[in-house]
């Protein structure tokens, strides 16, 4: 895992966009974002059970698995959104990026690799993108998992 401030430069979302300003796991924790590294799925299962999770799904984000829907799905995952419940994301292989909003409204990018697990708190704005490889991402959720609209859309409604 590597966390840093997103550079906000234009270009492919699947590139690192590393500003060079590192963010510690302690700073992530202050945002409510928790990081773990579990090489054993039994440890993931135990954490999920301890936190009251009952449901899970897995999605493989790749052109081979998604076919013609791939580009649209990658763009959809990168739309800023939040959930009413906490969620766990565990990377079984490959690499992906989670961007989470900091308290001062900037993006913090968290690069996750195989066996990395991230817990996102309820109500945090976030988005996800793969790198250019195929990434299976099990999503472990407590109950229903509905994405609420992004900040720009929510502001427009109010």
UniProtKB/Swiss-Prot annotation:
GO terms for molecular function: acireductone dioxygenase (Ni2+-requiring) activity; acireductone dioxygenase [iron(II)-requiring] activity; iron ion binding; nickel cation binding. It comes from the Eukaryota. Transmembrane segments: none annotated. Pfam families: ARD. It catalyses: 1,2-dihydroxy-5-(methylsulfanyl)pent-1-en-3-one + O2 = 4-methylsulfanyl-2-oxobutanoate + formate + 2 H(+); 1,2-dihydroxy-5-(methylsulfanyl)pent-1-en-3-one + O2 = 3-(methylsulfanyl)propanoate + CO + formate + 2 H(+). GO terms for biological process: L-methionine salvage from methylthioadenosine. Its EC number is 1.13.11.54, 1.13.11.53. Binds either 1 Fe or Ni cation per monomer. Iron-binding promotes an acireductone dioxygenase reaction producing 2-keto-4-methylthiobutyrate, while nickel-binding promotes an acireductone dioxygenase reaction producing 3-(methylsulfanyl)propanoate. Fe(2+) binds at residues 81, 83, 87, 126. This is Acireductone dioxygenase. It comes from Metarhizium robertsii (strain ARSEF 23 / ATCC MYA-3075). The gene is ADI1.
């Amino acid at each position: 895992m590597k966390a840093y401030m997103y550079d906000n430069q234009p270009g492919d979302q699947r590139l690192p966009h590393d500003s060079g300003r590192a963010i510690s796991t302690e700073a992530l924790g202050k945002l409510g974002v928790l990081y773990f590294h579990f090489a054993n799925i039994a440890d993931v299962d135990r954490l999920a059970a301890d936190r009251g999770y009952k449901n899970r799904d897995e999605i493989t984000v790749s052109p081979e698995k998604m076919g013609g829907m791939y580009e649209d799905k990658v763009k959809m995952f990168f739309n800023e959104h939040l959930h009413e419940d906490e969620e766990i994301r565990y990377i079984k292989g490959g690499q992906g990026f989670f961007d989470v909003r900091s308290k001062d409204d900037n993006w913090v990018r968290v690069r996750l690799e195989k066996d990395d697990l991230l817990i996102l708190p309820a109500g945090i704005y976030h988005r996800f993108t793969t790198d250019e490889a195929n990434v299976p991402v099990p999503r472990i959720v407590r109950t229903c998992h509905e994405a609420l609209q992004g900040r720009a859309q929510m502001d427009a409604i109010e």
